[in-house]
């Protein structure tokens, strides 16, 4: 029986992405440096991201509709403050009636921010 999602692993090209997710509210709880990359484990209220920091990986496709992770969606309590900070477009409403915006991380992965 599944009891939850343990973590989401994302390959990123630099510490800029680590900083981006920290600015969204994630906290670094563990870091491991290996010969070929670094692994940074982030947590926000039990939601964990495992970032593999490696500048040698090819860049992400510009088309999010390809196979694999399309976007990461998170819910925050400072929605209006965040959309001003990132100069976002006017928020939209999803099919559940919730406000959201998309913000690309430094490597182009879309992060869907929900109120």
What is each PLM-predicted segment?
Residues 1-18, 70-72:
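N-terminal beta-strand motif that seeds the catalytic metal site of vicinal oxygen chelate
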Residues 3, 36, 67, 96-98:
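Loop/turn position at the start of each blade in beta-propeller repeats
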Residues 10-49:
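Core segments of cupin and vicinal oxygen chelate
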Residues 14-15, 79-80, 106:
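Residues at or immediately preceding the N-termini of alpha-helices
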Residues 37, 56-62:
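A short, acidic/glycine-rich surface segment
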Residues 40, 87-115:
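Vicinal oxygen chelate
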Residues 62-93:
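Mid-chain, well-packed structural core segment of small domains
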């Amino acid at each position: 029986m599944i009891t939850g999602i343990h973590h989401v692993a994302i390959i990123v090209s630099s510490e800029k992405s680590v900083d981006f997710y920290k600015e969204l509210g994630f906290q670094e709880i563990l870091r491991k440096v290996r010969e070929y990359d670094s692994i940074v484990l982030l947590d926000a209220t039990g939601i964990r991201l495992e970032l593999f920091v490696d500048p040698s990986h090819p860049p992400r496709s510009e088309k999010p509709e390809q196979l694999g992770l399309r976007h990461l969606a998170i819910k925050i309590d400072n929605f209006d403050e965040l959309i001003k900070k990132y100069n976002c477009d006017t928020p939209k409403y999803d099919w559940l009636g919730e406000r959201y915006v998309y913000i690309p991380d430094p490597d182009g992965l879309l992060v869907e921010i929900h109120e």
